[in-house]
């Protein structure tokens, strides 16, 4: 809403294998005349939707969790949203593979600039949950992968991190609350790194539920929503190689040179505040120019839809344009 023009595009992006592959996404151009140098562009990385093609955000209406985007569009930013590799396009989505997601967030900016000469080189980025993970990877990759772009800052809401730590704890969880996400994490790792042999790690119940990760979106993984997390893996499964893979894709050790704002709700039970605190601590140790804001009483959904964090993110981005 509020755009002079909205486009659904197919563009070439670098896949998890390193080959070029078609990907999809959207471009929104502000109303009015672009400033000298072109519209600054904001690349938004979406949160978890699923792995099936039907879960691609470009196929749906703008969700409540993307309330920041119309605000930035009205303020004079071109807004782009990548669906990520394998969502809404050929191939499968390597969920939470950092390099794949990060490149998608940058590749759509390149594609947008080729098709819309009014878009300039000034880049800002943001994301929520999986998208926070993706945007942080994009911030790390930008100087070497897309040096023609001028990245000014990245704002992330409840960014996914410490997935390896959480995978190690699956056997201790006797409820199904996290099981749908666990299913997607397993499938994403399997797609990105088949040599891990993920399916061989599953229990009979896990194997029975596993195909659903390729067909259903996050809100409809019914087999997983009734499967206790500690029943997903086989009793004798050795998950160390899987944990090593997940740790290699964690954003915690990324070297990011441009400013980062991390916004976290204190009552989030999906991306736990303790993990975001650890992420911030490691960033500061590594001299990442990061600011962390905690929002009392906000959870995983409300942190990206409530007035205060939205205003703080918009202010952070505007100051760096």
Set out the residue ranges of the language-model regions:
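Short beta-strand/loop motif that positions the catalytic acidic residue
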Residues: 256, 261-268
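N-terminal cap/lid segment of alpha/beta-hydrolase-fold proteins
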Residues: 1-37, 41
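Short substrate-entry loop that stabilizes the transition state in hydrolases
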Residues: 18, 33-39, 44-81, 85-91, ...
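Alpha/beta-hydrolase active-site loop
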Residues: 95-116
């Amino acid at each position: 809403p509020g755009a002079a023009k909205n486009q659904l595009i197919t563009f070439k992006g670098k896949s998890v294998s390193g080959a070029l592959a078609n990907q999809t996404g959207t471009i929104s151009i502000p109303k009015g005349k672009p400033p000298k140098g072109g519209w600054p562009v904001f690349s938004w990385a979406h949160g978890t939707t699923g792995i099936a093609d039907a879960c691609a955000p470009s196929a749906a209406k703008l969700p409540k969790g993307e309330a920041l985007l119309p605000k930035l569009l009205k303020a004079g930013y071109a807004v782009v949203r990548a669906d990520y590799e394998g969502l809404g396009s050929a191939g499968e989505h390597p969920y939470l593979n950092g390099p794949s997601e990060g490149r998608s967030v940058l590749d759509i900016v390149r594609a947008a600039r080729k098709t819309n000469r009014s878009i300039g080189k000034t880049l800002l980025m943001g994301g929520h949950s999986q998208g926070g993970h993706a945007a942080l990877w994009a911030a790390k990759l930008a100087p070497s992968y897309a040096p023609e772009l001028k990245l000014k800052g990245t704002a992330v809401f409840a960014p996914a991190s410490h997935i390896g730590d959480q995978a190690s704890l699956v056997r201790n969880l006797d409820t199904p609350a996290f099981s749908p996400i666990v299913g997607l994490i397993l499938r994403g790792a399997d797609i990105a790194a088949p040599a891990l042999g993920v399916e061989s790690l599953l229990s009979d119940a896990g194997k029975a539920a596993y195909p659903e990760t390729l067909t259903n979106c996050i809100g409809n993984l019914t087999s997983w929503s009734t499967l206790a997390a500690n029943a997903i893996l086989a009793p004798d499964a050795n998950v160390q190689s899987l944990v090593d893979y997940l740790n290699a894709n964690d954003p915690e050790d990324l070297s990011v040179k441009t400013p980062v704002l991390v916004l976290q709700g204190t009552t989030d039970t999906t991306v736990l505040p303790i993990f975001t605190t650890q992420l911030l601590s490691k960033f500061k140790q590594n001299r990442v120019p990061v600011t962390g804001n905690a929002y009392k009483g906000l959870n995983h959904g409300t942190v990206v839809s409530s007035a205060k964090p939205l205003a703080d993110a918009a202010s952070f981005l505007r100051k760096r344009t």
